[in-house]
Each structure stands twice: as C-alpha cells, then as structure tokens.
Amino acid sequence: MQEARKCWGCGLVAILREGCGKDFFMLTRTDIETNMFPAAGSPPVRWRISEGLVAYGQAVEEMEREVAAIAAGEADELVWLLEHPPLYTAGTSADVADLIEPDRFPVFATGRGGEYTYHGPGQRVVYVMLDLKRRRQDVRAYVAALEDVIIRTLDKMNVRGERREDRVGVWVRRPEKPLLPDGGMAEDKIAALGIRLRKWVSFHGLSINVDPDLSHFSGIVPCGISAYGVTSLVDLGLPVMIGDVDVLLREAFEEVFGPAVPETGAGG
C-alpha cells in the first residue's frame, strides 16, 4: 500500500492500492480494537502547539516535510495542534455544487479524500503524523483510534460523543432540537476527521469545534451531508477555551497511542 485517503467526516477509505485483509470491512468501527501503541522502544511522539493562526498552505508544506522525514527515519512522530484563519478545503471528491458561497473565504484544494469542510478560529485542528509501521498497519483501525481520542476527550468534559457507521466523525445527540424528517433524533457533528497515508505515515488528522463561528459552515454543505447540523463545545454550554481542550486531548491521545512529549521550543 502506497497511499490512502479518507475524508473529513464522510465516506469510506479510498485505498489506492490493494493491501487490506479480507476482514477489513467486516467489523464496525465500534468493535475495532483501538489500542495503537508503538513497538517497544519507540521514542515518544512530539507534541507541538502553535500559537496564533497558521496559514493553510504553510501548514501543508510543513506536514509534507515532516511526513517525508518520519518515513525516512530522520524524525520522530509528530502531533501538531493549531488553528487556521477562516477557509474552506476541498477534498478529491468535492462537488462544486456543495460550495454554496464560493467567495466567502479562500478555498484550498487538498490531497485528502472527501468533500468540503471549514476551518477557522475557535476550532482545534490536530494534524497527526504517525508511522503506522511502528504501530498497526490497519487504516480502519487507525480511523477508529482517532475517533476514540475525540470521544475520550469529550467524555472528560461529560459530553457524549458517538460514532456512526455511515458517516465518519464524532456526533452528539440533540434531543432539544426538532426531530429529523424520518422521525429520528437530531444530531450535530462536533468533530471531523480526514486522513491521508504515505508509505504508512499518516497526515492531516482531526478537528474539534471548541468555539468557532458556526455560521461559517453555512457556506458549504459539510462533507456533502445536509441532513445534520454542526455544533461546538461552547454551543453545548461548556465554558471552555482551546487550551483547556488541549490538555484533555493529550491525555486521551496517550491513552490510545502512547506517550507524547512537548516538542522543544514549541508553545504549550
């Protein structure tokens, strides 16, 4: 397997070359074991927190450099926490009809799978660059593990996040909202994820809505899914800041992926 992509919160993995076992799609993501600790003797993951807003193009260039270095054995794995200025990104399956307001913010084409998503201030973006050869070479288990990190983080704030087999990401039930047209309970997305793998090194990652301007999601059909809404921790009534979430994110990450240490010279 050379490269695979997964969208920010929708669809199945697009495997560009074969490499998955016959049981790949048999288990639900809830049933998959999500322990992704590295092989014994592996160094801890670098944990980087950037202050201020990081331009999207700059972040992608940095990810590309880090992924190449990790794949070559020249750098340790990295988790990078940051915020972007307001923007939309288009995955490889993006339908231009889902870009409702094309002039609202800059739109970036990106190599990840999937459709459109929004990034902006108040949203914690987490770029996860791990060498799955040191862990488990299982794309679906990796996606489930990232979702598990989000769910554990939310649980530490007494928020129940849930998976849905037909839509990747993490969702919260909204019983106070009107029922869906099919009679089901309303649900909002609170966290999205979208990954790409190169030589079994992951990049891109996940995002958690802490306190973004939720109106900016109206400029797109997020991941092509119009039946459900979008929420944030503050929208749910939690008086939290991004720094508070960062502490819990690291705790949850270490429970699933193993030790992480602040990068020398990094903020946080």
UniProtKB/Swiss-Prot annotation:
Q: Which Pfam families does the entry mention?
A: LplA-B_cat (PF21948)
Going by the UniProt record, its keywords in alphabetical order are: Acyltransferase, Cytoplasm, Transferase
Gene3D superfamilies the record matches: Bira Bifunctional Protein, Domain 2
Give the matching InterPro entries.
aa-tRNA-synth_II/BPL/LPL, BPL_LPL_catalytic, Octanoyltransferase, Octanoyltransferase_CS
Q: Which GO terms describe its molecular function?
A: lipoyl(octanoyl) transferase activity
Q: Where is the active site?
A: 223 (acyl-thioester intermediate)
Its Gene Ontology cellular component terms are: cytoplasm
Which GO biological process annotations does it have? protein modification process
Where the record annotates domain BPL/LPL catalytic, the positions are: 73-261
DNA damage as a keyword of this entry, yes or no, is no
- Enzyme Commission number(s): 2.3.1.181
Q: Which residues of this protein are annotated with the site description Lowers pKa of active site Cys?
A: 189
- Where substrate binds, per the record, is at 112-119, 192-194, 205-207
Q: Which family does it belong to?
A: Belongs to the LipB family.
What does it do? Answer: Catalyzes the transfer of endogenously produced octanoic acid from octanoyl-acyl-carrier-protein onto the lipoyl domains of lipoate-dependent enzymes. Lipoyl-ACP can also act as a substrate although octanoyl-ACP is likely to be the physiological substrate.
Additional free-text comment from the UniProt record: In the reaction, the free carboxyl group of octanoic acid is attached via an amide linkage to the epsilon-amino group of a specific lysine residue of lipoyl domains of lipoate-dependent enzymes.
Which HAMAP family does its entry note?
Answer: LipB (MF_00013)
Q: What is this protein called?
A: Octanoyltransferase
